[in-house]
Amino acid sequence: MSKLIVPQWLLPKGVAACSSTRIGGVSLPPYDSLNLGAHCGDNPDHVEENRKRLFAAGNLPSKPVWLEQVHGKDVLKLTGEPYASKRADASYSNTPGTVCAVMTADCLPVLFCNRAGTEVAAAHAGWRGLCSGVLEETVSCFADNPENILAWLGPAIGPRAFEVGGEVREAFMAVDAKASAAFIQHGDKYLADIYQLARQRLANVGVEQIFGGDRCTYTENETFFSYRRDKTTGRMASFIWLI
């Protein structure tokens, strides 16, 4: 049975969301077992079976639109029309039955909806995309006001495991000096709190209803894939859609 995480937030009627773990698939080590990524060296047949299991367990209304994630800030609006490119790190929809999805294995997945339950989005926020403004770009796609938007921070590498160089801290502080609070000196490097950085960025554009942000993909090795921990590994995915 595929084990899913159901986000704990004030989800309005008409919106559904879930996030996968590594549990309940057919992939063999090091992709064991619910790997959803077709780009990381796993057997394609295993990935396809894993996706089928996930779609059934999550009761997804349609196949998600998989993005070509590049650690940037572009948002793909899912209109149902053919896409010239799926090269983006977030997707937005106001169409029932269209599934927004992002893949992660340490980077931060962020799911969005408005309180009226008429708009949804999903964003992939590694530190580069987060620093560049992928969350702000995603919020800007909403017709609703930021104060009416809810955000859920899905499983990512935790603040005790995310070691970065000083250049990462400097990049965030160049945008917002308050970002320094999310970094703790650790030898000649820093431990970064990607959840705190995301909350700061969202609050700066008026999104204050923020949930989640309490898991660690790096240390919870039986539950999550982690690229930093294992290098060759699978991918989880987070999904949101209008019913």
What residue ranges belong to the model's regions?
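Active-site microenvironment for binding and transforming phosphate-containing groups
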Residues: 1-243
